[in-house]
């Protein structure tokens, strides 16, 4: 499995069966095998997680087979093969992969894909969005909602390890920036974890690793 960081929450994952392009906003794509299928996944319609121009970009790159998996808050583009998804469901994909969706604490879904025995997780905007300016009741409910979804992921895994996970680490949350990441790492087993949604502040990953040295071996920098 090969992982390429694109921009913000956008990643390209190559497996033996296909490419997965998660939450593309903008950025350059690497050279790809045009005979291989690519699945474009967008967790929700926020501008930093979905850009409809991706489909014309892939066409200009010569990609021959393009599929799309879009959250149900996104207007479906004029494509021949689109799967529109909602939270809390399971789907069988075109090349015998399976997809489980989890409910975001903001909008849309998080993705858990199984592809020939390998597991890929992309959080979208599923995070413990605690803010200092919000009320205690808001933040308490947010944490409750987030932990419920992470616990559902752990239950779904039933002791298995995620091979590659993409998890929010947002510096705008200030002292609460690591709440979501820490709970995920404590309750979900993953081999490699890529922080995302950092708004260009890659230094926040160094801050996290300095404060949580126990995760040095599994946290991957862009």
What kind of feature is each model-predicted range?
Residues 1-8, 77-91, 177-222:
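Binuclear metal-ion centers of metallo-dependent hydrolases, dominated by the metallo-beta-lactamase
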Residues 1-35, 81-161:
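Core dinuclear metal-dependent hydrolase active-site scaffold
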Residues 21-22, 41, 120-123, 166, ...:
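Structural motif
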Residues 26-73, 155-166:
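Active-site metal-binding motif and surrounding structural segment of the metallo-beta-lactamase
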Residues 27-29, 46-50, 73-77, 90-92, ...:
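Active-site environment of divalent metal-dependent phosphoester hydrolases
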Residues 33-34, 52-55, 80, 134-135, ...:
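Short amphipathic alpha-helical segments
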Residues 38-40, 56-60, 138-141, 182-185, ...:
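Glycine-rich, phosphate-binding/catalytic loops in enzymes
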Residues 149-157, 174-183:
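A short, acidic, amphipathic alpha-helical segment used as a generic capping/interface helix at domain edges
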């Amino acid at each position: 499995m090969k992982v390429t960081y694109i921009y913000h929450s956008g990643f390209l994952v190559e497996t033996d069966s296909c490419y997965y392009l998660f939450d593309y906003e903008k950025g350059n794509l690497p050279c790809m095998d045009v005979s291989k299928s690519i699945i474009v996944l967008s967790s929700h319609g926020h501008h930093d997680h979905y850009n409809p121009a991706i489909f014309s970009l892939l066409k200009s790159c010569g990609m021959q087979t393009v599929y799309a998996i879009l959250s149900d808050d996104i207007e479906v583009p004029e494509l021949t093969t689109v799967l529109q998804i909602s939270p809390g469901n399971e789907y069988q994909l075109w090349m015998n992969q399976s997809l489980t969706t989890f409910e975001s604490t903001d909008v849309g879904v998080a993705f858990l894909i199984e592809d020939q025995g390998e597991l890929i997780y992309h959080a979208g905007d599923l995070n413990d969005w605690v803010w200092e300016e919000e009320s205690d009741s808001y933040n308490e409910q947010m944490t409750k909602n987030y932990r419920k979804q992470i616990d559902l992921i752990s239950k779904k895994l039933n002791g298995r390890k995620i091979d590659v996970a993409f998890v929010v680490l947002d510096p705008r949350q200030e002292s609460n920036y690591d709440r979501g990441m820490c709970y995920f790492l404590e309750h979900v087993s993953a081999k490699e974890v890529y922080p995302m949604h950092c708004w260009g502040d890659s230094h926040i990953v160094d801050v996290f690793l300095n404060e949580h040295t126990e995760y040095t071996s599994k946290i991957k920098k862009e």
